[in-house]
């Protein structure tokens, strides 16, 4: 395990990095700011593992890994996992938690574009969860993910749709009313319509395989996957 610093790349929003650096120490607090990520992680992991035909023995890259919630869970499934993030503090938290948990994950501080320049075609599975809406050029991230995966490999994206409902649910509801995440976490202007994401995918070697919505029920306080991509959604693609 290591957390290495690397040169600054153009596709970095330093204000976004600073937001997550400020709360990095609470990444593994199950009742803290990242509680929603802990709550949805079993759904994300299950979707990825099922669609990829299992993770055991596979080489996996988690782009925008943060404090390592998904990366660790994929390593527990028997994958060899590398986690990428540009936040130094979240990576330190991820590294320490993996050490305490006895989980082997290789954490690297560099952009996905930098990683793709050195490791093209080396991964069986690439995941990019809740990251695209936090960078200046999300299409560049999609291109890099396509470059990193092996032929026949799987790439997974998740993000937020851009519309009135997603603003009400993710910003007004989650940030201001329910206070599920810190205020300022989301910028609706950076949300991505499924048609936009699919358009970027179509310009790479990736092919869409499946898309699903991630839904929150405030009455039952539960999450589930299902039809409807009007707020949160996940996309499974495969390298041709």
UniProtKB/Swiss-Prot annotation:
Keywords for this protein: Methyltransferase, S-adenosyl-L-methionine, Transferase, Ubiquinone biosynthesis
Underlying gene: ubiG
One annotated GO biological process: methylation
Enzyme kind, highest EC tier: transferase
PANTHER family reported for this sequence: METHYLTRANSFERASE (PTHR43464), UBIQUINONE BIOSYNTHESIS O-METHYLTRANSFERASE, MITOCHONDRIAL (PTHR43464:SF19)
List of residues binding S-adenosyl-L-methionine: 44, 64, 85, 129
Keyword Methyltransferase: yes
Family: Belongs to the methyltransferase superfamily. UbiG/COQ3 family.
InterPro entries for the chain: SAM-dependent_MTases_sf, UbiG_MeTrfase
Catalysis: reaction(s): a 3-demethylubiquinol + S-adenosyl-L-methionine = a ubiquinol + S-adenosyl-L-homocysteine + H(+); a 3-(all-trans-polyprenyl)benzene-1,2-diol + S-adenosyl-L-methionine = a 2-methoxy-6-(all-trans-polyprenyl)phenol + S-adenosyl-L-homocysteine + H(+)
UniProt cross-references to Pfam families, sorted A to Z: Methyltransf_23 (PF13489)
Origin superkingdom: Bacteria
Name the record gives this protein: Ubiquinone biosynthesis O-methyltransferase
Single GO MF annotation: polyprenyldihydroxybenzoate methyltransferase activity
Function: O-methyltransferase that catalyzes the 2 O-methylation steps in the ubiquinone biosynthetic pathway.
Pathways involved: Cofactor biosynthesis; ubiquinone biosynthesis
EC number of this enzyme: 2.1.1.222, 2.1.1.64
């Amino acid at each position: 395990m290591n957390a290495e610093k690397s040169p600054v790349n153009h596709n970095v929003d330093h204000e976004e990095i600073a937001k997550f650096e400020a709360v990095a120490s609470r990444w593994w607090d199950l009742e803290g700011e990242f509680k929603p990520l802990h709550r949805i992680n079993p759904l994300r992991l299950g979707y990825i593992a099922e669609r990829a035909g299992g993770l055991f023995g596979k080489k996996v890259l988690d782009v925008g890994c943060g404090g390592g919630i998904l990366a660790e869970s994929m390593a527990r499934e028997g994958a060899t996992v590398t986690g990428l993030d540009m936040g130094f503090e979240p990576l330190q938290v991820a590294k320490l938690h993996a050490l305490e948990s006895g989980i082997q994950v290789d954490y690297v501080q560099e952009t996905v574009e930098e990683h793709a320049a050195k490791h093209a075609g080396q991964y069986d599975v690439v995941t990019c969860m809740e990251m695209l809406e936090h960078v200046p050029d999300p299409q560049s991230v999609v291109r890099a993910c396509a470059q990193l995966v092996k032929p026949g490999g799987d790439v997974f994206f998740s993000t937020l749709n851009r519309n009135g409902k997603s603003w009400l649910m993710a910003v007004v509801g989650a940030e201001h009313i329910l206070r599920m995440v810190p205020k300022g976490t989301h910028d609706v202007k950076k949300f991505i319509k499924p048609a936009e994401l699919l358009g970027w995918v179509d310009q790479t070697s990736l092919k869409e395989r499946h898309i699903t919505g991630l839904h929150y029920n405030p009455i039952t306080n539960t999450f589930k996957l299902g039809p409807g991509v009007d707020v949160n959604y996940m996309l499974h693609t495969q390298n041709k």
